[in-house]
Amino acid sequence: MASTNAESQLQRIIRDLQDAVTELSKEFQEAGEPITDDSTSLHKFSYKLEYLLQFDQKEKATLLGNKKDYWDYFCACLAKVKGANDGIRFVKSISELRTSLGKGRAFIRYSLVHQRLADTLQQCFMNTKVTSDWYYARSPFLQPKLSSDIVGQLYELTEVQFDLASRGFDLDAAWPTFARRTLTTGSSAYLWKPPSRSSSMSSLVSSYLQTQEMVSNFDLNSPLNNEALEGFDEMRLELDQLEVREKQLRERMQQLDRENQELRAAVSQQGEQLQTERERGRTAAEDNVRLTCLVAELQKQWEVTQATQNTVKELQTCLQGLELGAAEKEEDYHTALRRLESMLQPLAQELEATRDSLDKKNQHLASFPGWLAMAQQKADTASDTKGRQEPIPSDAAQEMQELGEKLQALERERTKVEEVNRQQSAQLEQLVKELQLKEDARASLERLVKEMAPLQEELSGKGQEADQLWRRLQELLAHTSSWEEELAELRREKKQQQEEKELLEQEVRSLTRQLQFLETQLAQVSQHVSDLEEQKKQLIQDKDHLSQQVGMLERLAGPPGPELPVAGEKNEALVPVNSSLQEAWGKPEEEQRGLQEAQLDDTKVQEGSQEEELRQANRELEKELQNVVGRNQLLEGKLQALQADYQALQQRESAIQGSLASLEAEQASIRHLGDQMEASLLAVRKAKEAMKAQMAEKEAILQSKEGECQQLREEVEQCQQLAEARHRELRALESQCQQQTQLIEVLTAEKGQQGVGPPTDNEARELAAQLALSQAQLEVHQGEVQRLQAQVVDLQAKMRAALDDQDKVQSQLSMAEAVLREHKTLVQQLKEQNEALNRAHVQELLQCSEREGALQEERADEAQQREEELRALQEELSQAKCSSEEAQLEHAELQEQLHRANTDTAELGIQVCALTVEKERVEEALACAVQELQDAKEAASREREGLERQVAGLQQEKESLQEKLKAAKAAAGSLPGLQAQLAQAEQRAQSLQEAAHQELNTLKFQLSAEIMDYQSRLKNAGEECKSLRGQLEEQGRQLQAAEEAVEKLKATQADMGEKLSCTSNHLAECQAAMLRKDKEGAALREDLERTQKELEKATTKIQEYYNKLCQEVTNRERNDQKMLADLDDLNRTKKYLEERLIELLRDKDALWQKSDALEFQQKLSAEERWLGDTEANHCLDCKREFSWMVRRHHCRICGRIFCYYCCNNYVLSKHGGKKERCCRACFQKLSEGPGSPDSSGSGTSQGEPSPALSPASPGPQATGGQGANTDYRPPDDAVFDIITDEELCQIQESGSSLPETPTETDSLDPNAAEQDTTSTSLTPEDTEDMPVGQDSEICLLKSGELMIKVPLTVDEIASFGEGSRELFVRSSTYSLIPITVAEAGLTISWVFSSDPKSISFSVVFQEAEDTPLDQCKVLIPTTRCNSHKENIQGQLKVRTPGIYMLIFDNTFSRFVSKKVFYHLTVDRPVIYDGSDFL
């Protein structure tokens, strides 16, 4: 609520301020007089404005605790602004004001008096940084709309004049409520006199009033007025011409105003068109984003369909493999059945044979009791006969009983055999039933195969459909790739259009700038017209004054009176006197006439030159018009090309939208097909499971058959045992028969001995027949036994074959199990592949999301760029406003300068009047005529010079005005062409919009038709899916019926529970194992899911680490780039130090021994030979005078003083072993001696050859110069315990052609550094006095290693900025700054410093890039500067254009790389224009 109340109060205050402004403007218009402090509307305005300035202002205070107010805000904003600074300085000059509030009120009153309040406040509000630092967010000055409204209201006060006293009020307490009346008009206490040239109008007014008073006080009786009247007609003609020109200029001003309005309208229309184009670009960008999203979705769906197709193909291959395995298993099963049938047929035959043999045996057994009965009867008869004859022995009875028992045992065995035969028959029946069941199962399998055929056909058809879909997807991908290329082309074209748009905006800005420039020119022209009007008024006044003087002269020259004779006598007496006066007066008159004629000639010459300049300006204007017309034509061509590109873009966008719609429809159809494929895959999986169940049943049947084979083996073993038992019984029977035969023979023999008659023979015959029969039976039994043995052998062979077959079947089963394992592995591989595909899909989704994020970031970046462009445009607008305000301020200053020029002309008139007064004084004082004439001559010469200067200034102003007029004419000529172009562009834009609307309507209609087609296709696909689902349901029913039949078969096989128990147990175990495997698979899946999640987390972490690594890599690369030089330096230092350490360790003992002798010798040489700097002012060899450029150098051997060029030789000292500077004579002496192997001209280091320097070669100069210390302190060579950096620098500097060694710098005066910090201006001409052979800098440029070259121009140096730039100089290298200068007279200044140590500096001049380096001139030789301690300043004046190379040399340092911080400036020469005399 508080915020709303504050806002409502703020709005009310702004409305009150607006009402006060309107009241002030009305009061000024009605009264026609300036507004004073008596006005109540002024009181209201001041209070409201102060409230707004203090509203929501931050509380600030000074160090003393005084509160800061809006006066400090004005100072912070306007302290550096030209024009507004005058008011601030004026308020600060008022000592009466003590508080910040009073100073702010005085500044507001100053701005009202000078009509600058709106401009100053606008400049303050444009400085948003300072405003936000002084005000909170609720302030109206931080709200652009409210601030613009306030400034727009205050701009109405620029036309209102205020008459306010600058002093006399206590502004610290309150605003003044009444107007203070001044007592004297010239009192300076109540006048606004800001301390500046631009605002001092009171001095001009006072001087103008003084000139009028002086003109009115002139004496009209002077004879020089006649001379002044001679130029009156010419002045009148000039006035007429000026009036005509004024009319023309006014008409031109009106035309330019109209053209300016038209241009503003055209610019506004162009801005609207740009906004529409921006909106279209935004819509196109949104469409592109939507297209990219659709393309990403299509890619995802295509990847999903591709994965499904891959899985379908893999499943198809698995099904084919399973079908092949099933077919192979069926073939193996059929072959096994055939083998078993082939094996069963001989077994059946053998069983039939055994049955026949058993029947025969039964028959024999049935006949055997009869035979036994007959034998018993015979035995009874025999016993009767024997009993009659002899009693029968008891042993035969016992044997007979045993035979009976044996017969009973045989009967029992026969019954057992019959039971075995029955069991075998039952088993055969079971086998037959099983064969029937197998045949039924085979028939069902054949049915399933037949049913699978259409399914396979459907699968093949779906595979074809999938292939078609794949082809479509490939085509779609090709289309998408083509569309992506088109999108890329569209983006490129869009970028090109944006660039062209930016170019057009730049051209519009340039046009606006030209318009502003034209407006400023128009303002200047209007100002000039006003100045001409004022001059016209002054000339009219002068004309009136001259006419009055003429009338006075005519009155004085009236009719002669009666005193004529007396006057004639007096005249006759005065004739000689008059003649003498005329002779004395003729000379100045002639001189005055000569001056006037010279002035007329000058004016004529000026007019001719003005006409020529006008013609040249017209020609230039015509050329500019032609250029503008050409530019307009180019702009029209660009606009047409942009419009054509825009139409093509719209067409492409429409085509892309249509293709996207078709892609969406095709994607929907692909999704439906994918659903159908998933359903078919489910059906195939169900069929696969059914096949697995059938295979399990077949395995169970095979196991049952194996059990039956085992039973058969057991039966064969039992048969073998029975055959062996029978064989034993036969043997026992044979033995019994033999015993019986023996008994019979014994009996017969006994009977024969007893002499029995013929009946015994008969009985013997019968017994023999019986024996023969028994033998025959025995033979038959033996044959049967042999046959049974053969059968047993055959059965054993068959059993072996069956076992072999069983082994084969087991091997086949093992193969099948291996195939099943392979299938399982394949299934697992498929699962893993599926999971891998899912992972890849997830990764692709992540990549897509990342791409989307990148695209969003790109969009955000584009939005930021557009916002930055808008901000830049706003800043440019603000800058343009600032420039317009500055132009207005400059306009005001020009007006003030013109007023000054008018006052100067008035002063010239005063001087002319003074001349006339002096002439009258000459007539009155004839004695002083000669002196006064001389004084007049001097004054006339001075005045002539001033007039000539004024005429030159006026000519320059006239030329500038003519150029401005020409530019205005050119701009006016270009306006109608631009208007026509804008009209054509608007018509084209309207036509383009209409065409775009029509194309959009057609595209919408096409899209609706395509949508209807795809909907019908979707309905057909749905119907096909329904039919396929029905077929699948029928197949499921058939499968259910087959399963029911299988269950019935299982029910029939329930009787074989005992045999199948083992198989059921095995199956249960298998199922348990399967359950375990399923559980393990579930656990593995969970593990996989966990691992996937962990992998995703790991991938995210890896990506984060990768990003961090990338950042670290970039940082390391940057650091590596910075540290490469340091590493090279360290490697060099390492190698060099290793070498030097060995050398120094060797030389250490010798140095210890030589140190005392060296000190003693140096002291002797210093005492005996060393000369002070003041003892020699010229070089002792070449007699050149020492100066800053030619410095003093002591020879370290003889101690005399030479210049650098005469003392540029180095020789190894005898005691210290160091290279020291010496003169030519000492160098020749030492070189002739045998003890200086290294005394070469250049003084190369040991083991490092370097080019020798000639004695005349200009080397670097020592930094000591004139101020070298007379008390020379030699380097302390007695201390060699620690190898310091300075010693290493001495070693490395001794082998190079560099400026000086550290011993030299130590020996020089410390004032040398002060002399090096500032270098005087040098030119190429200054180097002509120097010797020619300056080889060290040129050798460095030729053979030295360049690190960095930074070419600069004068314009780049002019825009160098306030800060310094960095230049890197690696060790043993140098860096170069070539400055190309195209004009002479410039002054190039530099300031540089180095880090961490000093650096050498030199300047070399080169005429052009093609000139060889041998022809270059050394302006400043190589100088070692202590730039690491203080800034080195210097400057150079350019007298010949060319290339000035600033060389920063670091070749003397082999280990330390350095950074140079430099700042360059350019000063142009000041052209004297005589403005001091205005």
UniProtKB/Swiss-Prot annotation:
One annotated Gene Ontology cellular component of this protein: membrane
Residues the record lists as Phosphoserine modifications: 196, 342, 878
Broad class of where this protein is predominantly found: cytoplasm
Coiled coil regions, renumbered to chain: 4-33, 225-280, 394-555, 596-1151
Annotated RUN domain residues: 36-169
Keyword Zinc recorded: yes
Zinc finger annotations (FYVE-type) as residue ranges: 1173-1231
Phosphothreonine PTM positions: 381
Residues binding Zn(2+) 1: 1179, 1182, 1203, 1206
Function, in words: May mediate microtubule plus end-directed vesicle transport.
Name of the protein: FYVE and coiled-coil domain-containing protein 1
Species of provenance: Homo sapiens
